[in-house]
Amino acid sequence: GFSACSLADNEVTGTDVNYRSVWARDGCIAIIGSIELDDAEIRGAQEATLRTLFDRLAPNGQVPANVRLDDGTPDYSGVGGICSVDSALWTVIAFHTYVRKTGDLDLLHAYAARLRGVMDWLGALDSNNDLLLEIPEAGDWTDLFGRSYHILYDEVLWYGANVAYGRLLELLQHFDAASECLRRSQAIRSKILADFWPSTQPAANAPAERFGFA
């Protein structure tokens, strides 16, 4: 899959061995960014990245933060024992991006149960049943930024992951589950807009759409 650095040009020692890894967040962003390239080697790296990550899910559905290239060992936290919530969010979105572009339904069927596990793991982070994820302190793989609870970055990705998973369920012909997931995505979207851009206007006077995102 996509590695964190050029394996031929970088000699790593100590904790830098992490760079000899497939990273979930970085690899999945690379999939999304390169999906329109008509290149067999890149397409192979996209598929290999997804397989590498989904073959090494934790039993509870957690996506590894990275997988070592030398021995295939998954790491779910990294140096310092931190978590990586955004890795799972990007992984679901990247999987849909790949299947939508390639039409690889065999890959989708092979990992359908594992995708469900990832979504269940993510859903468990909604600890108060308010549709949004409650992110632990420094819970994203973004240089340990000291932020927590409802984070716009994560919530928008959560919305996107639900849309992506709903579309994958449609491809699996699980139409009832797909409809439920897509309806939930719109409820998440409305919750994000209401919480992050609140208004003091009475609800009856407020415009139907003050802000929007795709």
Each PLM stretch: what is its role?
Residues L7, A24, G103, Q201-P202:
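Short linear sequence elements within intrinsically disordered, low-complexity coil regions
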